[in-house]
Design a protein with these regions (language model features):
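H-loop/switch region of ABC-family ATPase nucleotide-binding domains
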Residues: 211-212
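Conserved ABC transporter NBD signature motif
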Residues: 65-73, 234-236
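ABC ATPase NBD coupling module
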Residues: 19, 73-87, 95, 118-121, ...
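Helix-to-loop junction immediately C-terminal to a conserved catalytic motif
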Residues: 57
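A short, flexible loop at the N-terminus of ABC-type nucleotide-binding domains that lies
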Residues: 2-5, 14-28, 78
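ABC ATPase C-loop
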Residues: 167-168
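Conserved beta-strand-loop-alpha-helix hinge in the C-terminal portion
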Residues: 231-257
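The feature captures the beta-strand-to-loop junction immediately N-terminal to the Walker
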Residues: 42-44
Length: 275
């Protein structure tokens, strides 16, 4: 029997511990993902969802807990080393690519993901350019004709689509999507969401996706988990996930409020964010 694609066990982290600004971000969070599964993480600002993603990606080392990928303990691996087995798309389209390099050069860098201080030493061969053009052409954005265009000249949607391709160019054991449509306009968001679903389903990538969008949580993925105050408070999968509606998610947050886990102002913020 193969190991789970991801095991995050007992993740606990506190920012500014022992100071007046102390903030408990994660409280003994457990998350296990099977290969090819797609989990969507939903929660308000401060719920711990981004801290969870950062702990898995290696952007921060949790105070306690273990992270295993395909059975390997990566808890204390540096972020660049984890990038050999993880692909990540950030909220800001400019974060996952290098603006002054061309489309082709960015893809060439992505092909070296996980190698310490990977650099471009040789120009791309003609065959290499053709291969990159074919891969970029699959996005359907016309970027195959703009391989020599600096990435900084692309629109936010084009750049985020390219970053998604870069994150999956070398097959990752785990794909991390960190609110990757939050900075896009509605049209670009729809386009990138469609590309995301196509790439993940076609490639069978194990995916952990953080979002603020209830609509995305309903329509994407195999399981949605709700986070609040550093805990996973609900996990919805299987037939219930397939039949899930936005109204049911709203009801879940209302139940949290009535249980005195979310105050009235936070509940109102959730409605403004998610509807």
């Amino acid at each position: 029997m193969s190991a789970p694609a991801l095991e995050a066990i007992g993740l606990t982290h506190t920012f500014a511990a022992g100071t007046p600004s102390e903030q408990v971000a994660l409280q003994a969070v457990d998350l296990v993902m099977e290969p090819r599964s797609w989990v969507v993480v939903l929660g308000a600002n401060g719920s711990g969802k981004s801290t969870l993603l950062n702990a898995i990606a290696g952007s921060l080392i949790p105070d306690r807990g273990t992270v295993r990928v395909s059975g390997r303990d990566v808890t204390h691996w540096h972020e660049w080393r984890r990038s050999a087995v993880m692909g990540r798309v950030f909220q800001n389209p400019a974060t996952g690519s290098i603006g002054h390099l061309t489309v082709a050069e960015n893809l060439a860098v992505a092909a070296k993901r996980g190698r310490h201080r990977a650099v471009l030493r040789n120009p791309l061969s003609r065959a290499g350019r053709r291969d990159l053009a074919d891969r970029v052409g699959e996005l359907g954005l016309g970027l195959e004709d703009r391989l020599d265009t600096p990435v900084g000249a692309l629109s936010g949607g084009q750049r985020q689509a390219l970053t998604l391709l870069m994150a999956t160019l070398v097959r990752p054991e785990l794909l991390l999507l960190d609110e990757h449509t939050a900075a896009l306009d509605p049209r670009s968001t729809e386009q990138v969401v469609q590309l995301t679903e196509g790439i993940i389903r076609k490639g069978g990538f194990t995916t952990l996706m953080v979002t603020h969008s209830m609509q995305q949580a309903v329509t994407l993925g195999d399981r949605v988990i709700l986070m609040h105050r550093g805990r996973i408070v609900e996990s919805i999968g299987g037939a219930r996930k397939r039949q899930l509606r936005v109204e049911e998610l709203l009801a879940s947050f209302d139940r949290l409020r009535s249980a005195d886990q979310v105050d009235e102002s936070a509940a109102e913020m959730l409605r403004r964010l998610y509807i």
